[in-house]
């Protein structure tokens, strides 16, 4: 079979009530909110949805325990409320995870301070704490560096292993509500006329065609590119709006003694460091380094990789970790509010809405900051800012993909029977697609090609790729394998997996040899630029692990 991918209709000369620039989690959440309110909404993204900061984060949905140190109780309260909402509505994507706060005799924080902070954290949550068993606590303590006296403090937060999937679901809901969405569509400028933002000049990167749309409101949600959009549009702010902060992570094979809980500790320089179970691997992050370069080309430095490897090696000396345990490293630029001379840890994680009226651009607003946890509440605030009435959260209907428990064997069996696929495949489909999994499974019955695994080492099937192209606005192989069906983030993925996946996907999409080669080459370029293999820096990093 060959899947027909329809060309995208032109946007030229169309009118929208709201144009949202930037397809990360904040932009998608805002577009969804505006569309649900019945406003004609356009969402544009220069690359792919969730390809920026969203897919380069620590992947936790948290109340913000450390925000309490800076007195940001309101932000913690908001974050906890949104965490609980995501746990309830997106239970297949967002799950509780046990955290351990680690202290030793060299830690800057005292045990009393941590105990008081956790007490307040639980009070704000209005939720009884679930604690780890004593045996598991002792097991973790045994594998930590025995040269220190450790104190372990247990609390609960949440993890979204694949925020790319959360974005895909919200995107689907935005379109179902009437939004028009375009990825791989660059904003060349916002046209300002007579003191008002009126039009947006776009370039479709797939066709190379320039298009112009007009809007009642223009919302700049471009993350670390916010200031660039302003500069291109001749909107002059008194100071930069965003202070880009690079956060790097390393992904490691699971090692002996690797915890099933998330660990939260501090490095020698006081920086918080997380060690988390993720995607059958171990995720370690993050750093905070000022970054004024192109956010699209950011990459972890040798020094950052060394720093993170040294940190986790010091925590688990018995594991004898080395460069060879690192599968890859990645980095993203967090769009924190610009604060001259401030320490990174002191910069607020609260979001801000900057109205450009005083700068000669009425009806244009830039969104600064924001995080995975509070994207939905930011969207409601932004919609209200531009005069849109939005329902209270309790009135919002739960959409596709919610209200499923990925551990329910009955649901897994139903999906497996519907698609004639294995229980392992059915479980993976449910965890990534929620209630849509049953429709994808039924589609898979059409042919053996659709039931085939994407690559020999994956339980995810080609039918999920078809769903990505048909309903989730995937355009390239990278859109699919890194974000919609992110199997390429797995522990064993290699260039040979890329080739095998391209062959199987190409057979369904009807690619000829030329198209297959072009798609594969473009994907490998994107994958290797995003997921940096540290083996090329062995001489630097082996010393760090010794």
What does each of the following model-derived ranges do?
Residues 1-18, 33-36:
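Extreme N-terminal leader/targeting segments of oxidoreductases
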Residues 59-141:
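Dinucleotide-binding Rossmann-like beta1-alpha1 core, especially the glycine-rich loop
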Residues 22-24, 46:
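Glycine-rich Rossmann-fold phosphate-binding loop(s) that bind the pyrophosphate
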Residues 163-169, 173, 234-283, 290-428, ...:
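C-terminal catalytic lobe of FAD-dependent flavoproteins
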Residues 35-55:
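Glycine-rich FAD pyrophosphate-binding loop
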Residues 14-16, 207-217:
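Core beta-strand elements of the Rossmann-like FAD/NAD(P) dinucleotide-binding domain
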Residues 220-235:
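Flavin (primarily FAD) binding-site architecture
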Residues 103-182, 190-196, 279, 318, ...:
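Flavin (FAD/FMN) cofactor-binding and adjacent substrate-gating region
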């Amino acid at each position: 079979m060959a899947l027909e991918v329809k060309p995208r209709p032109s946007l030229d000369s169309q009118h929208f009530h709201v144009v949202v620039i930037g397809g990360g989690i904040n932009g998608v959440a805002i577009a969804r909110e505006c569309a649900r309110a019945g406003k004609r909404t356009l969402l544009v993204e220069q690359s792919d949805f969730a390809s920026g900061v969203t897919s380069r984060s620590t992947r936790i949905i948290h109340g913000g325990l450390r925000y309490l140190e800076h007195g940001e109780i309101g932000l913690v309260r908001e974050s906890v409320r949104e965490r609980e909402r995501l746990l309830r509505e997106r239970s297949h994507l967002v799950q509780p995870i046990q955290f351990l706060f680690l202290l030793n005799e060299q830690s800057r924080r005292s045990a009393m301070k941590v105990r008081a902070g956790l007490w307040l954290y639980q009070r704000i949550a209005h939720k009884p704490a679930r604690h780890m068993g004593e045996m598991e606590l002792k097991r973790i303590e045994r594998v930590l560096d025995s040269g220190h006296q450790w104190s372990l403090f247990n609390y609960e937060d949440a993890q979204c292993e694949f925020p790319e999937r959360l974005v895909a679901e919200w995107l689907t809901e935005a379109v179902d509500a009437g939004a028009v969405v375009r990825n791989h569509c660059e904003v060349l400028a916002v046209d300002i006329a007579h003191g008002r933002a009126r039009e947006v000049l776009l370039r479709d990167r797939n066709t190379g065609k320039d298009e112009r749309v007009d809007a009642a409101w223009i919302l700049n949600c471009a993350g670390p590119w916010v200031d660039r959009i302003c500069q291109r549009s001749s909107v002059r702010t008194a100071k930069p709006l965003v202070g880009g902060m690079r956060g790097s992570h390393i992904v490691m094979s699971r090692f002996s003694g690797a915890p099933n809980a998330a660990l939260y500790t501090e490095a020698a320089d006081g920086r918080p460091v997380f060690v988390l179970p993720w995607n059958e691997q171990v995720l370690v992050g993050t750093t905070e380094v000022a970054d004024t370069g192109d956010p699209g080309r950011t990459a972890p430095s040798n020094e950052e990789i060394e720093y993170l490897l040294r940190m986790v090696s010091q925590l688990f000396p018995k594991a004898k970790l080395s460069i060879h345990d690192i599968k890859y490293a990645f980095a993203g630029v967090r769009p924190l509010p610009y604060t001259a001379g401030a320490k990174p840890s002191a910069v607020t994680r609260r979001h801000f809405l900057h109205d450009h009226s005083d700068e000669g651009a009425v009806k244009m607003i830039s969104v600064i900051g924001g995080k995975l946890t509070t994207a939905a509440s930011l969207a409601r605030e932004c919609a209200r800012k531009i005069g849109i009435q939005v329902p209270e959260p309790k009135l919002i209907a739960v959409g596709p993909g919610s209200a499923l428990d990925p551990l329910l064997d009955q649901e897994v069996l139903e999906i497996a029977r519907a698609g004639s696929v294995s229980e392992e495949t059915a479980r993976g489909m449910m965890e990534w697609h929620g209630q849509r999994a049953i429709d994808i499974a039924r589609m898979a019955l059409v042919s053996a090609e659709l039931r085939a695994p994407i690559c020999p080492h994956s339980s995810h099937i080609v039918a999920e790729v078809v769903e990505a192209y048909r309903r989730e606005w995937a355009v390239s192989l990278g859109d699919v394998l890194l974000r919609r069906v992110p199997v390429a983030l797995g522990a064993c993925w290699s260039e040979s997996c890329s080739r095998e996946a391209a062959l199987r996907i190409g057979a369904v999409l009807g690619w000829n040899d030329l198209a297959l080669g072009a798609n594969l080459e473009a994907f490998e370029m994107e994958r290797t630029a995003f997921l940096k293999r540290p083996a090329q820096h062995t001489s630097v990093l082996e010393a760090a692990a010794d």
